[in-house]
Amino acid sequence: TGDCGACSVLVDGVLVCSCPVLGAEAQGKKIETVEGMSSGSELHPLQRKFIEHAALQCGFCTPGILVAAKALLAQNANPTETEVRYWLAGNLCRCTGYDKIIRAVMGAAAELRGAA
């Protein structure tokens, strides 16, 4: 039903929960998943910051949160903590309590802006 956000992907650059989307609806569209975030062996700054900040535990929610955070930073390179929390509200995590996730996203945003 798309309630937890773990299935988040970008469809033509728009963040969507993929589990309620039929394959026919995605035909001919650009689909971006967490697997496309890295460049070869070079991790995306969001992926690196998640590791640095220990922002994952079981990992179930991580792909969806990373894709959602990437979508946020594509629209807003300098989000406030409140904006990050609001943007990721559709992604549920039962392990981390979100603070480490928020710090990781804020750190990646700073790095991508060249402010880190």
Q: Where are these predicted regions, by residue range?
A:
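Signature of N-terminal electron-transfer/Fe-S-associated modules in redox systems
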Residues: 1-116
